[in-house]
Amino acid sequence: MKYYILVFSFFILHSSAINAQGLSKLEKKVLELVDSRNQESIDLLKESANINSGSLNIEGVKKVGAIYARELEKAGFTCSWISMPDSMKRAGHLVAERKGKKGKKLFLIGHLDTVFEPDMPFTPFTLVNDSTATGQGVNDMKGGDVIMIKALQALHAQGLLDDVTITAYFTGDEERGGEPVSVSRADFIERAKQAEVAIGFEGATGLNTIATARRGSSDWKLEVTAETGHSSGIFSDRAGYGAIYEAARIINEFRTALSAEQYLTFNPGLIIGGSEIQYNASKASGSAIGKDNIISPAVVVSGDLRFLTEQQKENARAAMRAIVCKSLTGTNASIKFEDGIPSMAPTPGNETILKVIDGISQDLGQGPSVAGNPGSRGAGDISYIAAYLDCVDGLGASGSGAHAPGETIKLNNLPYLTKRAALLIYRLTNK
């Protein structure tokens, strides 16, 4: 038994070590530069976090974009602003580019906006202790933006971005995307198609955990109508079961039929039923009037559906439609689906990029890196382009409480995460 344990342990250690290649002299210089500029990283984070850039705050999003453009120009990038139609009420996106002929063509992803709108209480950048800071968007995702930018600056200072092709794309409405998506993500998708590898700097779920897959999301709306009448007749062939019982049957059958499937979730977020109902989809709200002795003639239920692959999404939709069709007596139900953000399905190409990251984390003394659980992340901008190129995400800041007033970032992890990003960019563009 001891022999097998030793052999197995050796196999794991040896397999992980294969990806490590050791640090070159140039890489060591980059790491030293990152360390020497760590205070600059914190200062840039503070500067950008102290500007409210909620998705609907057009002026604030543009101000953060101007700060990042200033810093990216220091790394030799040419910056431009992609405006959105006035009717969309979104600021637009920042694009920074360098063009060359060497190595992989990279597409780096950040976003300028946060969930914190101007009408919410403002939380300035504040040091909690010597290793932690709080502030709006420090974790999601201004910390990740800073990691990307400072990694690029460190590489540029050593001349390691010469003749490479990199697009750094910062959307201005990731948290609350402009509609229609066919317009708000058109430029994003077209530029990504020209690259070979996409790297997302959303928050890290662990120092050694990388997202090689992310679930997609879509919406659904269930509508039920039914015969109405006095409650004394409910369950009879004449009166039937009413809309509320039918809606309850459908939702419960969704649960019993599909809830055990890995990575598939479906959540009824709003339900309205009664004698008279009003539903406002744009505001995700509604109202109802009903009496205890009247059989409900109408119900509306809205919810989301999250999935790992397009096939899983389509299979789930087919199963849900089949459940809806089995109407109880005196009722009629229909369900409609609306696509949202596609999934970032796991692929061999994504795993190949993970192996590069694994080698880097070991070279930096942090141990092996592994793929994270796709179920622990929601959908993101990278999912719009996952069908066109190899993708990894989660290379951003380490912290907690994203989207909450007490959102934090672990400043003591900032140097390592910046070094990891810099070496990943360098190794991919020098293959």
Tell where the protein language model's regions lie, with residue ranges.
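Active-site metal-coordination/substrate-binding segment of hydrolases
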Residues: 103-170, 191-193, 405, 410-416
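Metal-dependent amide/peptide-bond hydrolase catalytic core
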Residues: 21-27, 70-71, 87, 227-431
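Short glycine/proline-enriched loop/turn "hinge" motifs that connect secondary-structure elements
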Residues: 116-118, 160, 212-216, 292-296, ...
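Short, flexible, mixed-charge acidic loops at enzyme active sites
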Residues: 117-127, 213-218, 281-286
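Bacterial Sec-dependent N-terminal signal peptides
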Residues: 1-23
